[in-house]
Amino acid sequence: NKPAFTTFYKLYSINNYSHPKSLFFRAMCEYLHKKVDGTPDPLITKDGLTKIVKSATLFMFKFQSIKGGDSKDAIRYFEKVGKQFYGKNNLDPDWISSIFADALLKEGVDESMIRSSFINMDFYSKHDLAYCVLSLLESIDVKKNEDGSTSTRLLYSQASAMLSHIKDKTFHIDHMLPQTPD
């Protein structure tokens, strides 16, 4: 579960989203909660923390980075989450995840919109987004099942490792894009 958490947290950090900060802070505080005597007493599980980070980051990544949605439109969903849990003991990762999934549908963000955005997007002007997308695509593992169908999964460790190098100039977009000889 740690690679999944770090993958989505890196996506959040690379894209410099501001709206999830308070939600992530609260979720991490609940995960790191201790009893009065100092012994660990997490209010949410590691899986719950990962689910919150994943759902909020994917919402921002799909809505703001890919669709180009306005930050002012995104904040209302984070406000809804904040109001729901203000003064309460712990967050509900399933409820939070469903809020962001519903928000994407409400904002018209679906698979066809994402494909259309990718076709028309100038990734050279959006270096960090291009690097994130290519890192995720490169980390997809496709397996053929016995019944002839295929299944896909994201290799979180690989994605996390690739995303770690976005700021250190180890790779350039030109290294990741297919090259056509002249």
List the predicted regions and their residue ranges.
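A cross-family structural signal marking well-folded subdomains
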Residues: 1-146
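Generic recognition of flexible, low-complexity loop/linker segments
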Residues: 7-14, 158-163, 167
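Short helix/strand-bridging catalytic loops that position acidic/His residues to coordinate divalent metals
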Residues: 38-45, 159-162, 182
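Short, contiguous, well-ordered secondary-structure segments
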Residues: 135-163
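Histidine-centered nuclease catalytic patch
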Residues: 164-182
